[in-house]
Structure formats: C-alpha cells, structure tokens
UniProtKB/Swiss-Prot annotation:
The chain crosses the membrane at residues 6-26, 41-61, 143-163, 183-203, 250-270, 292-312, 365-385. Probable gustatory receptor which mediates acceptance or avoidance behavior, depending on its substrates. GO terms for biological process: chemosensory behavior; male courtship behavior; monoatomic ion transmembrane transport; sensory perception of taste; signal transduction. Keywords: Cell membrane, Membrane, Receptor, Transducer, Transmembrane, Transmembrane helix. Expressed in neurons of the terminal external chemosensory organ of larvae. Residues 1-5, 62-142, 204-249, 313-364 are cytoplasmic. Its main location: membrane. It is found in: Cell membrane. This is Putative gustatory receptor 47b. One of its GO terms (molecular function) is taste receptor activity. Belongs to the insect chemoreceptor superfamily. Gustatory receptor (GR) family. Gr57a subfamily. It is a multi-pass membrane protein. One of its GO terms (cellular component) is neuronal cell body.
C-alpha cells in the first residue's frame, strides 16, 4: 500500500461498512481514483437499506405481538415494567438509527470535505518532512480488525438474545428476520462510534508528530530552514484544530445520540439483571446475553471517552510546546512575533472533542453516564421493592380475614 493511500488503507473498510449499513451516502476512494464522493446510486442504496432495516424490524415485532402463541411465549412471563423496557428498546434502536442517518445526511458536504482534508494531510507533511514514516499497518490492525472482532461478538450476542427471548420454535422466519434487522440497527451505534474514535486518533497522532518534530527542531542550529519548518508545524497544528472542529460538526450530534442510547440500554438491561438477582430465580441464557450486551456498550463508552481525553491532552501539550518557540530562539524577532500571533490565535480557538454541541468528551463522560445509570437503576429497584411489598401485604391481608357465614341485614334493633 502506497503512503498516499494511507487514509483509505486504515479507514476505507470502515467507511464501506457505513455505506453498506445505510448510515452514509459517501464512498471513500484514494485520491488517485477520485477521492470520496456521493452520487445518486449511493443515495438510492442507502435509502433502500434504511427502509428495509427499519420496516422489516418493526413488521416482525408487530407479527410477534399479534400472534397469540408467539406473544404469550415472548411476553407472558414478563412483568409490566420489563415489557415496557423491551418496548422502549425496540423503539429506541430504530429512532437512534434514523437520527444517525439524518444527522450524517445533513452534514454530508462537510463530511466529504473532512475526508478530503484528512487524505491530503499526510501527503503535505511528507513534502516538508520526507523522513516521516507513517505506521499505517498499526492503525489498520487496531481499527479494522478490532471492529471485526468486536462486531462478531456483538452479532453473536444480539442474535442469541433475540432467539432466546422468543422462547418459541414457531415463526422461525420472522424470528430470523427480527434478529438480523435488530442486530444491524444496534450495531450501527458501535460502528459509527469506531469511525468517530478512529478520526479522533488520526488527529491525536498528528499532534504528537508535531511535538516530536518540534523537539528535534528546537535542538537544531539556528537557520532559516529550521524556522521555515517550525512555521509549517504551526500551520499543521492549526489544521489539526480545524479538523477537530469539523469532526465535532459532523459527528457531534451522532455521538451524543449514540452515548444516550448506550446509557438507556445499559440502564434497562442492568435493571432486568438486578430484578433477576433480587427475586433469586435461576439464571437462563437470556440474562447472560443481556450482561454481555452491557459489557459491549460499556467498552464503547469507555474507549470513546478515553480517546476524547487523550486527544485533548495531546492538543494541550502540542499548544504548550509551540508557545515555547520564542524561549528556544530568544534572539530572533521572527520567533517572538510568531509566538505572539499564535498565543492570540490560541485564545480564540480552544477546540476539543465534543458530544453534541456543549459536552466535553473526556474521562468525566464515563462518570456522567454511569452515575446517571446507577441513579436510575436504584430508582427502578426501589419501585420493584414497593411493588413486592404491596403484593405481600395483599396476600397477608387475605389470610387474616375469615368468613364464618353469611351476614344478615343489620337494623337498629341490633
């Protein structure tokens, strides 16, 4: 793989999956083959895929509900609250998928420009620093093969959960279609999350490269060539900040919708698992699959927040090191002017990875999600205890009342 095709080599397969899932209408190619593009064929394919997945999933759910035998097998043993949880999950996975598609469609032009700038980024760096060696193989190993492994596990857990939830051998075709479409809908959350993480890591690695090159140039002899290269690194850091701002614009809303979906499904499944533990009933595979689902969503929330924090830390370190330019070349007016201009620019450009438009994506996001999840689970468990106490009180009251015989009319003579 040529170095000019590094972005496609690392992330091209992930973007192909986004297109196959119907999430985007963009197809990514190397610059020699025209670069990223969107045409009527990709749009038609995406619209067909979206319609097929959402309509087929909702149709299979309605089929299960309308058939008395299948409905009794799936929902007859569940409490009203757990039924509401499963209903919410069916609606939320479809709504989140639609939100993803609409958000990315609205940002399509911006997305195309972002991909084009990332494809051009490395080639421009090699023109000034030809000795730089990009480790594309490591990035591909981490994101493409990592996505395949996690995706295979998620597919296995989701399909197994649906088959175990149906609790009925009747309606196998509808069960297969429901399991397949549900898995595609829910896996879209993780797939887009991996692409978001990959681009954050792309920017983080370039900011680290700026620091490594600066350390070398700060120790070099004072010459015009050194100052020209340092000036390029200033521009390179600004381009990274611009890419980060564009990344937030393209993926910010989708990332917020994805984390909210992770929060809701983990809250619901953790409550169902807690209910099973409190009632001291024997476990069945359905709850094991729920626990594995929670583990996958936990993994996504943790690594997304972690990469957001690592990007923020790398950016701060890079900005701080650039601000030391005038200190290393104290006798140069060009260094002093460049540092002053950069400090002024830095005051007005404090980009960081965001969830939505206001929430910083950092380690604190993990606390925010799990603190909220714990609070809601505690409330639901308290509600479960209250329902159990009411039920026990009703049973006790029934045992305390003994009917001896029929009571006659009561008059004033009594």
């Amino acid at each position: 793989m040529q170095r000019d095709d590094g972005f496609v080599y690392c992330y091209g397969n992930l973007y192909s999956l986004l297109l196959y899932w119907g999430l985007v209408t963009i197809r990514v190619r190397s610059p020699d083959r025209g670069g990223a593009f969107s045409n009527r064929w990709t749009v038609c394919y995406a619209l067909f895929t979206r319609s097929f997945m959402v309509i087929c999933f909702m149709a299979t759910v309605m089929t299960k509900l309308r058939d008395p035998e299948m409905s009794a097998a799936m929902f007859g043993h569940l409490s009203p609250l757990v039924k509401a949880i499963f209903t919410w999950e069916c609606l939320s996975c479809s709504v989140t998928y639609i939100e993803y598609c609409l958000s990315l469609d609205l940002q399509k032009d911006r997305h195309l420009k972002l991909v084009a700038r990332m494809q051009e980024f490395d080639r421009s760096v090699l023109m000034v620093f030809p000795h730089v060696q990009w480790n594309y193989r490591r990035a591909r190993l981490k994101y493409w093969y990592g996505t395949v492994i996690v995706g295979f596990c998620f597919f296995s857990f989701s399909i197994s959960l649906i088959f175990d939830t149906t609790r009925c051998t009747c309606g196998i075709p509808s069960t297969l279609l429901m399991a397949f479409t549900y898995t595609l809908l829910t896996s879209s959350v993780g797939l887009l999350g991996f692409v978001h993480i990959g681009i954050m890591d792309f920017i983080r690695v370039r900011l680290r490269l700026v620091q490594q090159l600066l350390h070398q140039l700060y120790q070099a002899d004072d010459s015009s060539e050194v100052h020209e290269r340092i000036a390029y690194l200033f521009e390179m850091s600004k381009r990274c900040s611009f890419l980060l701002a564009e990344l937030n614009g393209v993926f910010g809303f989708a990332a917020a919708a994805g984390i909210f979906y992770d929060f809701t499904i983990m809250t619901c499944f953790v409550y169902v698992i807690c209910q099973k533990l409190l009632e001291r009933e024997p476990w069945d595979p359905e709850y094991v699959y729920m626990l594995l689902h929670v583990a996958i969503h936990t993994y996504k929330v943790v690594i997304t927040s972690t990469y957001g924090y690592l990007l923020l830390r790398e950016k701060r370190n890079c900005m701080h090191l650039l601000s030391q330019y005038s200190r290393y070349f104290s006798g140069q007016d060009v260094a002093r002017r460049k540092t002053e201009d950069f400090q002024h620019w830095r005051m007005h450009n404090r980009q960081a990875a965001m969830v939505g438009s206001t929430t910083l994506l950092s380690v604190s996001t993990i606390y925010l999600v799990y603190n909220g999840m714990a609070n809601y689970v505690i409330i639901l468990v308290q509600l479960l205890f209250q329902q159990q106490q009411i039920k026990d009180h009703q049973l006790t009251s029934g045992k305390d009342v003994d009917i001896v015989g029929p009571m006659g009319p009561i008059t004033h003579m009594d």
